[in-house]
Amino acid sequence: MPLTVKCPICKAPVEWVPQSAFKPFCSERCKLIDLGDWASEKHVIPVKAEFDPEAFDEFDLDEGDFFKE
């Protein structure tokens, strides 16, 4: 008996077999809805922001230095 999972979008049952063209989704519609959610940033992968202010020190120029020749 094949494994059955729920479609992440509509919760319909999906058999996890090679013939399931859209797995883990039940249909192309649900697959495209999920793609749209990623594209519109409704889904994001959490990443710890690592801001290193020293990495930008080389770009810190005094305004007077900017226009010197």
Curated annotation (Swiss-Prot):
Record keyword DNA repair present: no
One Pfam family in the UniProt entry: YacG
UniProtKB keywords: Metal-binding, Zinc
Cofactor(s) essential for the protein: Zn(2+)
Positions contributing to Zn(2+) binding: 7, 10, 26, 30
InterPro entries, alphabetized: DNA_gyrase_inhibitor_YacG (IPR005584), Znf_NHR/GATA (IPR013088)
Cofactor: how bound: Binds 1 zinc ion.
A GO molecular function held by the record: DNA topoisomerase type II (double strand cut, ATP-hydrolyzing) inhibitor activity
Domain of life: Bacteria
Gene3D superfamilies: Erythroid Transcription Factor GATA-1, subunit A
Biological process per Gene Ontology, one example term: regulation of DNA-templated transcription
Record SUPFAM superfamilies: Glucocorticoid receptor-like (DNA-binding domain)
Assembly, per entry: Interacts with GyrB.
Annotated function: Inhibits all the catalytic activities of DNA gyrase by preventing its interaction with DNA. Acts by binding directly to the C-terminal domain of GyrB, which probably disrupts DNA binding by the gyrase.
Family membership noted in the UniProt record: Belongs to the DNA gyrase inhibitor YacG family.
Name the UniProt record assigns to this protein: DNA gyrase inhibitor YacG
Protein species of origin: Shewanella baltica (strain OS155 / ATCC BAA-1091)
Gene: yacG
